[in-house]
Amino acid sequence: AGAAANKELMWKRAKGFFDVVAYTGTGSARTVPHSLGVPPEMIWARSRTTTEQWVVYHSSTTLGSSPPESIISYLNLNNRSGVAANWNNTAPTDSVFSLGTATTVNQSNIPYIAYLFATLDGVSKCGGYTGNGSSQTIDCGFSSGSRFVLIHRTDDPDDDGVSGDWYVWDSLRGIVAGNDPHLSLNTSAAQVTNDDSVDPHNSGF
């Protein structure tokens, strides 16, 4: 059998860019301090010792009149985003993020890990866009293109509870003007190599 081809993706903790927070759940609504220095635009959180989903907050996700802090997505599922009080209906600040009482983020005496992401000019971009059914450029404010792209659809066009996978492209495997291999964070499937969904662009993709 051939050797497995593994890829590792790493982020360095830095103010205004990325932070990692370990905390223990209390079962009561609360805030958790962080060192990002700016309000996180995306949060991934998960229990470290119990069987739970990866819960996602994203500042660009809205559902009807519901704001981002009232919405959750699941990083390990292709489910549509939904309204829930995991973030205690409170937007994160430059020093804390808020938790409700959901066991996915705040069960009493359970240890959790949270990854916090933010936009740092010229380095990273957390945002959203609306598809147009045709080609479009997503301007991330970069000068030499994207090295890592994560895309997830948040609506549910077929009203079946499914929105789409969490697709990942990176420059190591290739972001080119042609087919680009992509992985899905929510599946264990091998990468798809015969698809041309993204192309390189100096400002983003």
Language-model regions, residue ranges each:
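Surface-exposed molecular-recognition determinants
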Residues: 1-205
